[in-house]
């Protein structure tokens, strides 16, 4: 009977909220991060989790960069089938630009994450910019003087 009484208290409006939001055993960590207005009574030494630095959270340039990365990724999802269904020079040059941008931004993030030191990181990013420019120039040269990206991939598939 005592168990049913305690279960009834826990399942009431206040008891269920207390069980689900206040108990560290039940509450997942990601919920804890967003419940920062009232600390849990009886718990000391809890830290507030900040998901992003406050000085970068309002940056319009970072938001536009993130959005443009997603636009290029979605554009690639449409260009690849378009290159298969309708291989033409417009799709070839669009693929050259989108693939170069996508790989440049992706490798740039790897450089940012894993290359340490300001001078080394700047030199690596300068090298990446040079390689990306040469890649785009090479793909455009290939599109202009040869069969193009779409037809070249189709020829490879026929092998």
Swiss-Prot record:
| Mitochondrial matrix compartment spans | 57-63, 112-120
Pathway membership, UniProt: Carbohydrate metabolism; tricarboxylic acid cycle
> Which Pfam family, giving just one, matches this sequence?
CybS
Q: List this protein's GO terms for biological process.
A: cellular response to hypoxia; mitochondrial electron transport, succinate to ubiquinone; proton motive force-driven mitochondrial ATP synthesis; regulation of catecholamine secretion; tricarboxylic acid cycle
> Transit peptide, first to last residue?
1-56
UniProt cross-references to InterPro entries, sorted A to Z: CybS (IPR007992), SQR/QFR_C/D (IPR034804)
Keyword Transferase recorded: no
Q: Which SUPFAM superfamilies match?
A: Fumarate reductase respiratory complex transmembrane subunits
Family membership noted in the UniProt record:
Belongs to the CybS family.
User: This chain belongs to which protein, by name?
Assistant: Succinate dehydrogenase [ubiquinone] cytochrome b small subunit, mitochondrial
Which organism was this protein described from? Rattus norvegicus
Its taxonomic placement starts with: Eukaryota, Metazoa, Chordata, Craniata, Vertebrata
Which gene does this sequence derive from? Answer: Sdhd
